[in-house]
């Protein structure tokens, strides 16, 4: 890598504004300066600096995907370290710099094998960084399975949760649950003690059950609108709870297929942007090369 790289004639998204005709100076894989075209023209660079004309293209912080099962023909359901590492490598081609590999509900042995594979891959990445583990189950509603298998879900089971946690060596950071399940408060207390963020998803919860979930510190919602109780004027359900309570954050699969694009526009008029997380929920065949 050159001593310094300067990407100029770029549109920079810095999280606060859109900066046009800007340059970004990189040294040893780190951004050391961002400046406008006027400073770029006047600045004196080192003789071995490499210049790249972005031709107006965007430069933005890397994407972080908090809900992803697979990519490019590799997936968490392979239960293999090499599949997780391949996901890491391929995701960088699409601007992803960090991701949370997500496991569906599965028989205990498979879930533990999947957890072991992710833990084993951590620290060996050559691409996007593995930020932790997201368990999408097994404590979810049989009435809102989506594509998950009814044979793989489970009532709340603290002993099972402890086995999954121990296998993760402390790396489970998110878990999708159905707040209405019996003994959910007990599970929530356990997860709070471990620093696990609980998310309401694959849930048939009534509005009052969602409120009870919030009292148990379930403040995030998995793929809003998908696999959850709908909003109704007599019972707002899981969807309605997100719109009624500003403290609830939500993830959305904004691909125009899982939800209509105008629903996304509606959502951003109702929720603060810092309460909306874009996720892919991508599966193994996504961008698979033939």
PLM feature segments, named:
Residues 109-236, 287:
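Histidine/acidic-residue-rich, glycine-tolerant segments that coordinate divalent metal ions
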Residues 209-290:
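Active-site-adjacent C-terminal substructures of enzyme catalytic domains
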Residues 97-98, 173, 219, 274:
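Short acidic/polar active-site loop segments enriched in Thr and Asp
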Residues 68, 179-180, 203, 255-256, ...:
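Active-site metal-binding loops of divalent metal-dependent hydrolases
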Residues 2-6, 12-60:
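Histidine-rich, glycine-flanked metal-binding segment
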Residues 10, 24, 29, 56, ...:
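Divalent metal-coordination and catalytic microenvironments
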Residues 57-110:
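Metal-associated gating/positioning segment near the N- to mid-region
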Residues 6, 62-64, 199, 278-279:
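Residue-level marker for buried hydrophobic side chains located in beta-strands
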């Amino acid at each position: 890598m050159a001593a310094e790289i300067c990407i100029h004639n770029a549109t920079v998204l810095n999280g606060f504004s859109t900066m046009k005709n800007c340059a970004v100076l990189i040294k040893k894989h780190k951004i050391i300066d961002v400046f406008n075209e006027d400073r770029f023209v006047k600045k004196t660079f080192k003789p071995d600096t490499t210049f790249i004309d972005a031709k107006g293209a965007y430069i933005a912080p890397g994407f972080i995907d908090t809900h992803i099962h697979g990519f490019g023909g590799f997936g968490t359901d392979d239960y293999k370290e090499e599949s997780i590492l391949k996901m890491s490598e391929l995701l960088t081609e699409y601007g992803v710099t960090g991701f949370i590999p997500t496991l569906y509900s599965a028989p205990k042995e498979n879930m533990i094998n999947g957890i072991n594979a992710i833990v084993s891959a951590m620290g060996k990445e050559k691409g996007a960084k593995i930020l932790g583990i997201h368990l999408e189950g097994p404590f979810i509603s049989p009435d809102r399975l989506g594509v998950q298998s009814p044979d793989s879900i489970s009532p709340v089971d603290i002993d099972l949760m402890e086995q999954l946690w121990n296998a993760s060596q402390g790396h489970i950071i998110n878990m999708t649950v159905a707040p209405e399940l019996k003994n959910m408060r007990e599970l929530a207390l356990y997860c709070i003690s471990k620093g696990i963020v609980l998310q309401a998803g694959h849930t048939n919860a009534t509005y009052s059950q969602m409120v009870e979930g919030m009292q148990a510190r379930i403040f995030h919602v998995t793929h809003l609108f998908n696999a959850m109780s709908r909003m109704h004027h007599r019972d707002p359900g899981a969807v309605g709870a997100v719109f009624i309570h500003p403290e609830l954050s939500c993830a959305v699969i904004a691909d125009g297929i899982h939800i209509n694009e105008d629903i996304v526009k509606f959502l951003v008029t109702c929720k603060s942007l810092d309460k909306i997380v874009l996720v892919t929920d991508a599966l193994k065949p996504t961008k698979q090369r033939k």
